[in-house]
Amino acid sequence: MKYDTSELCDIYQEEVNVVEPLFSNFGGRSSFGGQIITVKCFEDNGLLYELLEENGRGRVLLVDGGGSVRRALIDAELARLAVQNEWEGLVVYGAVRQVDDLAELDVGIQALAAIPVGAAGEGIGESDVRVNFGGVTFFSGDHLYADNTGIILSEDPLDIE
């Protein structure tokens, strides 16, 4: 499904929070949306492997990497796993790598920047926790919508149809 965050903001202005414009699109899907699962991890993507193994249909993985752009939390291998398990998208408050490969995959990926250095894989981090970045507080179960214009968040799903 295609999402237009500008249109959604016009219709649901009082019901959405708008994330500050910090993110760029790296995935092959220009827009995506779904119910979020929150993750907090710093320069370590081991926990992301576990979560992306789950069925992601209708879900978006929201990763608080502390804003670090020293190590990429998402690479082509993880993005392929997201596609395989039907995740709608990934939002990473951190970095990604292998961007040419990411752009070819049918998954939304928004992140701060790209860097060639990979993350550690020790599995350090926590999921289903409150995270805050970009002027917005995110909880697992909230609904996120993203496109090339921006990212918005709603406590409840928006009536798109």
UniProtKB/Swiss-Prot annotation:
Any single Pfam family the record assigns to this protein: RraA-like
Q: Does the keyword Metal-binding apply?
A: no
InterPro entries on file: RraA, RraA/RraA-like, RraA/RraA-like_sf, RraA_gpbac
Report which superkingdom the organism of origin falls in: Bacteria
Localization (cell) = Cytoplasm
- Gene Ontology molecular function: endoribonuclease inhibitor activity; enzyme binding
Query: Sorted alphabetically, which NCBIfam families does this protein's record hold?
Result: NOT-MenG, PRK09372.1, RraA_entero
Say what the protein does.
Globally modulates RNA abundance by binding to RNase E (Rne) and regulating its endonucleolytic activity. Can modulate Rne action in a substrate-dependent manner by altering the composition of the degradosome. Modulates RNA-binding and helicase activities of the degradosome.
Q: What quaternary arrangement does the UniProt entry report?
A: Homotrimer. Binds to both RNA-binding sites in the C-terminal region of Rne and to RhlB.
Q: What is this protein called?
A: Regulator of ribonuclease activity A
The encoding gene is rraA
